């Protein structure tokens, strides 16, 4: 009799484990053992046994992010947040946009930008602009001028530039200072003097974007340099 009851309970549990899917309009796999579910037009995450590990409240969950992004982008009412694949909320869905870059998040709200860490801690005040990180630095704009931040939110190069491009893989960036463009290294040392009216990166159609050059204009004349600042 005891064995019979155990068998009945086991069958009931198996039925319960499979029946949980019926309450959802869609059940989809993710990169982990957890699954994404949809009820109406709302999404959430559940465990393999059907236990909800997030509320089914999101308008969108990106369960297939880029390989370097170990989190899920979520959306509620066109505002974005971040959750872990385990369902834990990292950043509430209250930002206009979120970028993940070198272990931290660039968030945008009402045309202002801020850096947050993976614990939703503010690393910077609000700025007019923050780019994603290239070669360990990101340009930021504050009160009309550009400088460069590291992923800790520290200001590495001061807000003195009129305009800025990101650092290339050779460790140089084109920046505009007192109305003219030049090239600097990561310490702010001048690689190319500030004497050009225009600077624009480009690549040949047959080359990868990483293999780009800069087109410069000085006194109306076009010049070309490579990523190290050498004239071609």
Please identify what each model-predicted range represents.
Residues 4-12:
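Sec-dependent N-terminal signal peptides
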Residues 16-232:
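Residue-level detector of conserved, function-critical positions
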């Amino acid at each position: 009799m005891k064995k019979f009851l155990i068998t009945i309970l086991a069958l009931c549990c198996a039925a319960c484990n499979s029946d949980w899917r019926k309450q959802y309009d869609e059940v989809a796999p993710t990169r982990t053992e957890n699954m994404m579910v949809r009820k109406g037009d709302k999404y959430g995450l559940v465990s393999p046994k059907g236990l909800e590990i997030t509320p089914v409240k999101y308008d969108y969950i990106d369960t297939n992010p880029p390989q370097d992004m170990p989190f899920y982008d979520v959306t509620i009412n066109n505002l974005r947040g971040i959750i872990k694949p385990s369902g834990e909320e990292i950043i509430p869905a209250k930002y206009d946009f979120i970028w993940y870059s070198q272990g931290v998040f660039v968030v945008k709200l009402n045309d202002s930008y801020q850096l947050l860490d993976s614990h939703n801690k503010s690393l910077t005040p609000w700025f007019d602009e923050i780019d994603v990180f290239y070669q360990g630095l990101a340009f930021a704009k504050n009160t009309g001028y550009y400088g460069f931040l590291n992923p800790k939110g520290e200001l590495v190069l001061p807000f003195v530039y009129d305009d800025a491009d990101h650092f290339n893989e050779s460790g140089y960036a084109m920046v505009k200072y007192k109305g003219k463009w030049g090239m600097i290294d990561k310490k702010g040392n001048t690689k190319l003097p500030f004497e050009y009216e225009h600077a624009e990166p480009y690549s040949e159609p047959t080359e990868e974007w990483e293999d780009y050059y800069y087109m410069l204009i000085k006194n109306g004349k076009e010049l070309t340099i490579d990523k190290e600042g050498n004239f071609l």
